[in-house]
Amino acid sequence: ILRGAGCGALCRDGRELRLAAACGFAGPAVAYAPMRPDAAAEQLARELGAVFVLDGPQVLPAFAPEAAVLLLRQQGPLRISGRPVMGAPVSSAGMEEAELCRLAACLHAGGTRTLGLGMSLGDLCMDEGFYPAVFAQLVAAAARLREKSGLTVRIFDLGGGFGVSCRPDCPGPDLSACAEALRAQTCTLPEALQGVQLSMSPGRF
């Protein structure tokens, strides 16, 4: 059902990759985000055509994948239109920008053709400004990466975020407002980032 609806599969190890394959997931619909090096899982992910999601050099695969998303450490508090995003604590996940740039250059030299940036805050944020604020930080980081190394980002992974409200006194985020904010942001992207692919996994936590 989920595959038919256009969803993807986020896999952490070989067992989850095999399950995704059995359900018919393949290609960019599979994201492989390893927690530790695993040669067998890396090979299976490569055979599936998965996008590798890497949060540091400690999980760098033995051979550069066709496509990789590098996770950026949050660059200060999330803000949108000058206001702080409520319910989104500062996260230490991901890489500092300098380390990310080095890893991007290494992957590119090794043959990675499609490069992405992502942010994984792992929080059930109920503010519709969450994804637009993450998007803004990734756009800024992508611009600096291109300026420093000439590499162009093709994917933005906005990570997890929205949960489902089960309390009438705590309404969930306005998804239409979030979508409209993201649409407006994509309309102002620099030429090099036009057509960037967006992915996100709301509710996965």
Question: Model-found features: residue ranges?
Answer:
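Active-site-proximal beta-alpha core segment in soluble small-molecule metabolic enzymes
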Residues: 1-155, 190
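C-terminal active-site-proximal or functional interface alpha/beta core segments in diverse enzymes
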Residues: 130-205
